[in-house]
Amino acid sequence: MKLSSILYVSVLAHLVMSKNVIDLDSFKESLHEEDHDKRDGKNVIDLEQFEASTQQEQNEKREAKNVYNLQSLKEDHIGENEKREAKNVYNLQSLKEGLDDENDKREGNVNKPEVSEEGSNKGDKRSMQNVIDIQEQDTHQNLLQSILPQLQSITIFTGYIRDDPELAMKTADSKQSMIIIAPSDDSISSKLNNLKPWEFPNELTGNSDDDRIVSENLKNFLNGHVIVDFKDKFVTSNDEIIANLVNGKQVKIKQEGSDKFKISTGDKWIKVETVKQVDNGYIFVINDVLVKP
């Protein structure tokens, strides 16, 4: 009885131990296979996604870069063309103006007008040249029409003269004698209470009459700065030249020293910044305006 019991227990123990060994080995193999499959699967998926993502990103960068460069190149090309075209237009215009000026100068040398030796019956009878002594370097053997565009400080006023047919014709007339008292560009911009010469004395209405009003206002402004037929109308008094502007207002001109002039239409004397003498008159540049709102 004891022997059979011992054998039974021994066999049972052996079976249990064998079963545990088998289960442990199977468990290890199962874990190893599962872990290997998981690692392999994870690595394959990540690698494919990474390659696909990287390739797509590189393609997008290349495509975007190409588009940007082409657009920039196109814009740069257009910009260069515009610069070249603008430069060509400017050069052609400058050449045309230069040729026109040269023609004007040659035409101005044909007939040099005589300067009156006497003034009016009023005041002293004196030579205009004795009263106005212009330095030789400021004397030009040409006409007002050709010298006006060369004075860069009065381009606005010169433009007004050019756009007035009657006055422009006089500046080109070698038999004319004129004095142009030209306001500088700065004075026209700063001394008219923020108005333009064509905006006063008559206000614009905003209708079809505006063209006429603009023309009349500019005419009024010009007539207040110009003396025509000067050599036949001036008088002298106390070393001053007195004459009437086209608008009828009296103006006085006096010289202080060899190159200093002043102009007055009332009690105030205005310094003359630049003086030029040509065959058919004088240009006096001032940093003020004689006609104000």
Curated annotation (Swiss-Prot):
Family matches, as InterPro entries: FAS1_dom_sf, FAS1_domain, Mug57-like
Keywords, ordered alphabetically: Signal, Vacuole
Domain FAS1, first and last residues per copy: 141-290
Pfam family, one: Fasciclin
Signal peptide positions on this chain: 1-18
GO cellular component, one term: vacuole
Comp. bias intervals (Basic and acidic residues): 76-87
Gene3D superfamilies, per database record: FAS1 domain
Protein name from the UniProt record: FAS1 domain-containing protein DEHA2G15708g
